[in-house]
Amino acid sequence: PEISFTANFGFKQPSAAPEWSDYVTSMKQYNRAQANDGNWGAMVPESTITAWENAYATGNYGPYNDVFPEVDWWKELVKNVGYEQAYNLNVRGGTKKMSYFVSLGYLHDGDIFNTTKQEDFDPSFSYRRYNWRSNFDFNITSTTKLSFNVAGKMGYQNQPSYYENVDSPDERFFKTFFTAPSNEFPIKYSNGIWGDGLSSDQNIACLMNEGGSRNIKQHQGFYDVILNQKLDFITKGLSLKASLSYTTSSSWTTQIMPGKILGKDDLVAQRTHIRINRVYDYANPIYNADGTITYNYTEKRYPDENAPGDLPVGGVYDGFKAYGRKLYYELALNYSRQFGDHDVSALFVFNRKMNESTNTANSGVMNFPAYEEDWVGRVTYNFKERYLAEFNGAYTGSEKFA
């Protein structure tokens, strides 16, 4: 047999990272815009700007700073590089009576986000795929050839289980990357509790790492049997081809939701984690005896003031997502022969298709199978390749017009 093996390694990285202005510049430009519109009451107090200027001057700021948080969400959550790898093994060989080809493949597309594996789930973005193909051709006799073909793939897509009960969760997730405030709260406060905005659900690090995980499993299978038979023993130039194809596809979703109550939608995973937001009174700094400066603050706690703490994983379940199968069979009778200056050919084809799938509105319900049937015929004639004639006919239908 002939054996070949290939391995490919690649890396990916963002072509460009967004750049942000510092908070002091943003506040000053904001005040200028408000002044132009005469919205004096909406302007940021000078005491706040001064406090932040001092924080920048002394380096007293950062993504985990309680009083002066500054988070570059892109820098904190996006890696410089992500990796992918692919392997493929091919084997071919055979004899005069039989030939074969077998191929096995594996692909792994790694994560470009900085996620942290949790005790009960892995929130990373990743994709794994296994694919296979095998072709077997048998020369049963000098006039009979039989082929078996099998192919398929199995894919596993993993991602955080964010925004479970909203439309377009992926779109909303990536939008949060650019809309999450940079200076309203730290990733985590010094007491270890996640930070969050005044409007809640704005800490994308908490959302991505603590919101659970979703694993989508997808399978596709393709199966073919083809028979080619020469019928010269009946009349020269006559042949028959019969084929049968069967295709299946299915997908499941395994979802882990911390605090999720099965059968209800009243708890979104990320909301089961304790988060706080602090608003500091920069206008009234407190000068301590040791030379440090502190500020009083008001604190808001999520999901509510009496929340006891993070809830354990409350929902782990396999959800049937979609299923489909297709059956196709065909019988073709072909005749081609030359009588001196006369060429005659004829073709008759019969095929039937069946398609069955789950209802898109309710994945637990199967649609009625759809059927299509075709009867096709063609006859051609030419004399010295100068005078040509062709006759075609077809009769088609489906269960919709029975």
What are these regions (language model features)?
Residues 6-10, 131-133, 222-224, 243, ...:
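One-face residue pattern on beta-strands with alternating periodicity enriched for small/polar residues
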Residues 1, 96-97, 112, 143, ...:
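Short loop/turn motifs that connect adjacent beta-strands in outer-membrane beta-barrel proteins
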Residues 9-13, 95, 106-110, 152-156, ...:
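Transmembrane beta-strands of outer-membrane beta-barrel pores
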Residues 3-5, 100-102, 146-148, 238-244, ...:
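Transmembrane beta-strands of outer-membrane beta-barrel proteins
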Residues 1-220, 226-232:
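Membrane-proximal, glycine/serine-rich, low-complexity loop/turn segments characteristic
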Residues 14-18, 111-115, 145, 157-161, ...:
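Outer-membrane beta-barrel proteins
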Residues 20-26, 118-123, 163-177, 256-267, ...:
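Flexible, surface-exposed loop regions and adjacent strand-edge segments
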